[in-house]
Amino acid sequence: MREFHYGVHMLAVEVGDITESDAEAIVNAANSSLMGGGGVDGAIHSAAGPELNGELVKIRRERYPNGLPPGEAVITRGYRLKASHIIHTVGPVWMGGRNGEDDVLYRSYRSCLDLAREFGIHDIAFPALSTGAYGFPFDRAERIAIRSVIDFLKDESAGYTVRFVFYTEDQGKRFLFILSDLGLPVNWNRDVQENT
């Protein structure tokens, strides 16, 4: 894990299983149905237990009968996860980059952060939204993720911890390269070695 400061905020780059994160909230790369699926979505549903599905059925029925629109987010309890909450967002499906995908992805990250603030959550873990089955090019997606997160943090005086959790070491290294390439005014705190 690599941690660094951005003003009063902490950003972390982690490699591993987001369902094991001890952040206050983890973000689920959901589909519009909110009923689970493959990848991160399926893993979170499985780890959280069947109670999660019950809460999401209620949210669908009461607030989103046609499904959660891309770029929006909803929050649920974490149930059997270490995280107390799950923030579910629907990222865009990559259609070549000419259908507003960048804006929708930006809004997906921002919607999650806005919900975190609303619920008093100051430690949130994100997967690489839309970069799996939805086909969004990784480097482009992560530049958008960073921009959305930094735009949120620069206006916040309360300290937040934002974690970017990647499935592979290669993704984590690519993300660190993107951070460096963007020339953000961050202060590297440390490399944190995991005890295995």
From Swiss-Prot:
Which InterPro entries would you find in this protein's record? Answer: Macro_dom (IPR002589), Macro_dom-like (IPR043472)
Positions of the Macro domain:
1-183
Record CDD domains: Macro_OAADPr_deacetylase (cd02908)
Q: Where in the chain are disulfide-linked cysteines found?
A: none
Task: Give the source's domain of life in one word.
Answer: Archaea
What Pfam families does this protein's entry cite? Macro (PF01661)
Give the residues annotated as coiled coil.
none
| Cross-referenced Gene3D superfamilies | Leucine Aminopeptidase, subunit E, domain 1
Please give the family membership noted in the entry.
Belongs to the MacroD-type family.
Q: Which PANTHER family match?
A: GANGLIOSIDE INDUCED DIFFERENTIATION ASSOCIATED PROTEIN 2-RELATED, MACRO DOMAIN-CONTAINING PROTEIN
* This protein's name: Uncharacterized protein Ta1105
Question: What species is given as this protein's source?
Answer: Thermoplasma acidophilum (strain ATCC 25905 / DSM 1728 / JCM 9062 / NBRC 15155 / AMRC-C165)
